[in-house]
C-alpha cells in the first residue's frame, strides 16, 4: 500500500474510533476566523493531537481540532485551524485533512483564509470569493506515485472552485448586504510575508490576493472529486501597497472586526449548498 494512503487510512480509522458522525459539508477556518466553530450546535470535537499520525497546527489563532455538529439541520465538520507548508510538514501532510474529509464521505468543502490584498480596489475587511488560484510556488501534493483510490493521474483543474457554489455565495452575500469581491488567490510558501517585489510579480501574474494556504488543499480536494468553494478575508494590504509593516496581530484584529458578517455569510452558504 502507498505510504501516504496508508497514513490516511490510519487517521481515518482513528477518527472513526472516536465518532460515527458523517458530515455533508466540511469547512476549514483560516487565521482569526476560528470562532465560527463555537456558533454551531456541537456534537463532538476531536483534537488533532489525538488522531494517530495527524499533523498538528502551531500557528496562533489555529486551535487545532475537528468540530462535528450542525448548522441548522446540516451536518458539518469544521476544521478549527489548519496546518501549513511553512510549519515544516511535507505537502502530503498539509493536504491530509481535506483528503481525510473526502474519504469520510463529505463531498462539499468550503475553504477560508486570511489573505493580503493585491488588488488596490480591495480594503482590509473585504471578503473575496476565490475564482481561481496560482500555486506554482509550492510543490503539488500530487507529485509522486498516483494514489488511484483518491483520483486519476492527470486531473482536470479548469474549474477548481465550483461555479455552482460561487453563484450561491454571491447570491447570499447580496441578500445579506455584504460587499463581496471576486478574484484570483496566490499561494506562496511563507512564513515570511511577501516582499514588495514578490507582490508586483503576483499582480503581474493576475493575482488579487496572496496567502500561505488553501490552493494546495483545493487542488487535493478536486483530485478526489470534491466540490470546492474558497473565501478569503482580506486582512491587510500586501507589502508595498501601504506604509504599514505586516504583522499577524493585524490579521487577527481585522478578522475580529468582520466576524459577524463572516458568520452570517458562511451560515447562509452552508444552508444552501
Regions found by a protein language model. Give the residues of each.
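Polyanion-binding loop/helix "lid" in catalytic or ligand-binding cores
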Residues: 150-161, 173, 187, 199, ...
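Metabolite-binding pocket within alpha/beta catalytic cores that recognizes anionic/polar moieties
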Residues: 1-157
